């Protein structure tokens, strides 16, 4: 598995990060003689602009030029944000619209991240792993290869408190919808976690667990192959 960022490294990263409140400003007015700050990204025509800038910079600009503005609309989706979303340009995986993946998360080759899934800082999505709709990988949670994390499932994060151990999901594990894997739990290779299970202790390799708290109910060898199949076609990309 890929090496984790430590909790202290993540905490330091967040602490040191320049906090950002980016704005998207739609503005009409008389800007013929206006010089926009170099930090602004400005698009549009002479009398109608779209501006990308920081909130504090816009405030100063507006105070100096508000008399020239006839119409104004501002979009703001975060405040003093420390961690931007991950740049996915070089990510060799299938990422669907509406997935939230933060910087310093790792998405390995052939992974699939579905709509509404959230991957926090320091989390690792292993090769060929699928994170289904609205599932959450908390800080430093790790999956191995060819794992399926079902819709709405939660792998708890462990940035705070920093002493906690991260969730680790080994290769070829199936996690059912709305299951919760608590901090420090390790799920062994080939195991199955039933839908809605609350997993509070390590799961042995090849075991099937269910319930609240989750307990071993049988072995995966007793489960039909068709019910635990990982479908490679769902992970196929255009370059394959």
UniProtKB/Swiss-Prot annotation:
Role of this protein: Catalyzes the transfer of an acetyl group from acetyl-CoA to tetrahydrodipicolinate.
One Gene Ontology term of the molecular function aspect: tetrahydrodipicolinate N-acetyltransferase activity
Taxonomic path: Bacteria, Bacillati, Bacillota, Bacilli, Bacillales
Keywords: Acyltransferase, Amino-acid biosynthesis, Diaminopimelate biosynthesis, Lysine biosynthesis, Repeat, Transferase
Family stated for the protein in its record: Belongs to the transferase hexapeptide repeat family. DapH subfamily.
Pathway annotation from the record: Amino-acid biosynthesis; L-lysine biosynthesis via DAP pathway; LL-2,6-diaminopimelate from (S)-tetrahydrodipicolinate (acetylase route): step 1/3
Enzyme Commission number: 2.3.1.89
Organism: Staphylococcus epidermidis (strain ATCC 12228 / FDA PCI 1200)
Record bears the keyword Repeat: yes
One Pfam family here: Hexapep_2
Organism superkingdom: Bacteria
Keyword Transferase part of the UniProt annotation: yes
Broadest EC class assigned to this enzyme: transferase
Gene Ontology biological process terms, A to Z: diaminopimelate biosynthetic process; lysine biosynthetic process via diaminopimelate
Catalysed reaction, written as an equation: (S)-2,3,4,5-tetrahydrodipicolinate + acetyl-CoA + H2O = L-2-acetamido-6-oxoheptanedioate + CoA
Record-given protein name: 2,3,4,5-tetrahydropyridine-2,6-dicarboxylate N-acetyltransferase
């Amino acid at each position: 598995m890929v090496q984790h960022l430590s909790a202290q490294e993540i905490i330091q990263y967040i602490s040191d990060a320049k906090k950002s409140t980016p704005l998207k400003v739609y503005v009409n007015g008389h800007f013929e003689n206006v010089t926009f700050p170099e930090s602004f990204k400005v698009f549009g025509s002479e009398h109608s602009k779209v501006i990308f800038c920081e909130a504090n910079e816009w405030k100063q600009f507006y105070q100096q030029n508000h008399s020239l503005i006839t119409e104004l609309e501002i979009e703001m989706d975060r405040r003093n944000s420390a961690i931007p979303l991950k740049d996915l340009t070089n990510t060799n995986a299938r990422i669907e619209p509406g997935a939230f993946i933060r910087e310093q998360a790792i998405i390995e080759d052939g992974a699939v991240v579905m709509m509404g899934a959230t991957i926090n800082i320091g989390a690792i999505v292993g090769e060929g792993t699928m994170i289904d709709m609205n599932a959450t990988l908390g800080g430093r949670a790790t999956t191995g290869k060819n794992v399926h994390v079902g819709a709405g499932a939660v792998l708890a994060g462990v940035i705070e408190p920093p002493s906690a151990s991260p969730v680790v999901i080994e290769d070829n594990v199936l996690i059912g919808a709305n299951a919760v894997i608590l901090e420090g739990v390790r799920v062994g290779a080939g195991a199955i976690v039933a839908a809605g299970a609350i997993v509070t202790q390590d799961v042995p390799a090849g075991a099937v667990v269910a319930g609240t708290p989750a307990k071993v109910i049988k072995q995966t060898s007793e489960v039909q192959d068709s019910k635990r199949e990982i479908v490679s076609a769902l992970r196929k990309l255009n370059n394959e």
